[in-house]
Amino acid sequence: MRRIVTCVIFIAVSVAALAQQDAIKGCVKDSDGNPVPGAIIKATSSSTILGYTTSDDKGQYSLSVERKGDVVVSVDCLGYESSSVILHKDTSGTCDFSLKEKRIGLKEAVVRAPAIRQLGDTLSYAVSAYTTRSDYTLKDALKRLPGIDVEESGRIKYLGKDISGFYIEGMNLLGGKYNIATSGIPAAYVNSVQVLSNHKEAAIDRNTFSDDVAINVKLNDKAKIKPVGSYEASAGYGDRWLYSAKGSAMLFRAKTQVIASLDVGNIKGFALDEGTDFLKSESDVTAVKRLAGGLSASHPPMKADRYISPSDMAVTVNAIHKVGKYSTIKVNAGYSSARSDYSYSFKGQYYDEDGEIVMSQTTTPRTKTQRPWLSLEYQKNSDKCFIRETLHGNMDFTRSAVPVELNGEMSSQSQSLNSMDFGSDFSARWRRDKLLWSVSSDMAYSASPSYSLNISSGDGGISQSVSGEVFSSENTVSAVWEKRHNRIYIPLIFNTQTDWLKTDRTGDGLTGEGNDLRVSKAVLSFSPQYEYSLRDFVLRAEVPVRGDAIWRGGDMTEYFSVCPELYLNWRLSARSTVRTAVSYSRNISDVLDFLTRPVQIDRTTLQIAPGTASDSKYLTANAHYDFKIPLSQWFVNADLAYVRNWRNQLPSVTVSGGSILNDRALAPNVSDNIIAQIGVTKQIAPIKTKVSLNGSYLHNEGRTMQNGQVMDYAGNSLVLSPSVSSHPVGWLELNYSGNLSRTSSRYEDVAKSYDSRSHEMSIRVSPVQSLILSAATENTRKQLTDDVFKTMTLLDFGLIWKHKAWKLSLDLRNALDQRSYSYTLYDSINTFTYEYALRGREVIFTAVLTI
């Protein structure tokens, strides 16, 4: 309760502080009365800068400053004479400017466009100002831009926040599958990358507040006047023969965009990554897939192409076409086939009051996944209404073989999973009189008609089968009333979900080891929301009143919840923004709560549940701060979050010999998490250098049960990730990225900690315009036990020759022929040590043609 009061007081103080600020606003026009966008307006007092901003596309601006005395308001804009006025303390804060055109006689000079420009909520990067000769794809270019981070998976973030939209010339061709574009579009086709803050996908929402951010890619004329493409072929040898071939054909016209791609090869795994939807919620995974995901889910914290031997194929066709002025139709289709195999050894040290239980195993997972998918969308997006209907579907066919040696005993495991997902998403918004109406209905059907796991060992065999279906619908009707700075939302939400789940476990001596479940859930929620919005300040309060009903068999259980949320967004100045939110939420029941008979997950692991609905409540408080000076290319973001979780079920693990039983005990418990993150980026333009420092800290406390003993535990994790990307002169490029971490765990009278360090460095030298020589190294030092450390160094060399539209490269990977990688993890009270086999030395030749 004290935490809630503290958060409310903090927000109240913030509002009070805002009230003490005076608004200075006005309009900047030229001598003909036309608005002047992009003018820099600055407020000073006694040579102290109180704040600054830029004028929008209508020439308007607004500043919030503390006026203790006279304030000088000045305006500067390229091509116009500077102007300033003095606002006395007791005068109005309205200040309009009429600028005179400035005529300057210039000597002969080379004029360069600025690397970065800001106009209102749009930040535009000139890509050519950041890229180097070695940057080939759009993804390579995005990694160079200050303030933008691209994760290894391809996910894009701006100032620490995931993007909510990805556009090419203003058109949403790919949705969340933007990996297809960032991996396929050559950087040479891109003029600029725009970051769209306060992003709203619907034009009807243009006057509403949003803290979403999106990316818009602006192409050069070469990419827009004719079909373009990129084609690549590679061949090489390592532990086996290596090959790859890929091609992308692209068309970007004013009304039509098309990207078609075909990739095949066994050098890198790519098929499943290209189909990843970064805008889709991970909670959409069905119960059957969650049960099937534990067989070969272990992956180390390193690039997959260092240890996985893949064989992938992917084909995609994506097209969007404008129909009339406001409407578009879009189709996205693809097929992915991914095969992979790798090997690793694992040692688990499980806590037991009589001494640690140690389990050791070696395994070689081999998996093949085939995934066809299709999406069709119609959208109308005008100032008066927004309509969108999306039909989507995909199928998964997965086969896995996982031989394992457990404590010296060999076993074989094979897995087969077939699944399909289909859905229809409809949404519409329109204005009528003074109300903005909104209707949405999302329906989804998922089926996994056949999942099987077969295990054979010297003790006999076990077969586990699972099948399931899920039908869900999410329906919302809402009205929004607006008056000046006030908005009242009145939404009514009705969601339903029905799960069918059937399991059967057979083997020597096993009888009655099955579950036959049907669980239905309905949620009715009335969620009134009030929003007070100014140009630089938004306060939002929401009080959802919710009723849940759960049916299992002939029994029905009802729940009633009130889940308030308070949100504040305050733009302190043109440079900095603060966001805070406090919320209470509740998550009730999952079909896996009712697994009263064990389900075999893998050779050693069983899963079971108490047979009653889980009930988890969350108190979440978070604060975000970002600071940016685009012209000086400084970007800073910081986040702090606290999460308290009340649960009615306690995780329980029983470890004995070569088996693990995951269960939950009916025991109320509480866990706490504190998460802090910071990111700082500075672009040093004269030497074309990007310097970044990212850091994170995690503290968690909770309770768990193992082998019948209840224990409290606490853990800490601190990670620092510095990076430098420098192109100081035309013939030299230097890159460095590091990861320094310390993890600790404490339970009972036991305290453990381990350190990890990794460094990646590369140098590229271009002695002549068309030739690039490169060398790169990865060095890691991992602590495995209290006194045991393992150091590993990987070394790569490369040669690139460019001539007109051709790029030829020769790469030597893992030149030192390193064959293993080890690391240690702490999971509450248990310790796990892994050792992965690496791919050996490889030589690869690649030819790329861009047209």
What residue spans do the PLM features occupy?
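Face-selective signature of the C-terminal outer-membrane beta-barrel domain
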Residues: I320-A338, T367-P403, S411-G553, S561-P564, ...
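Membrane-proximal, glycine/serine-rich, low-complexity loop/turn segments characteristic
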Residues: Q20, G33, K58-Q60, E81, ...
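Structural motif
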Residues: K25-V36
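Short, acidic Ser/Thr/Gly-rich low-complexity loop/linker segments typical of extracellular
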Residues: S47-Q60
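A short, solvent-exposed loop/turn motif at the edges and junctions
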Residues: T44-T48, D70-V85
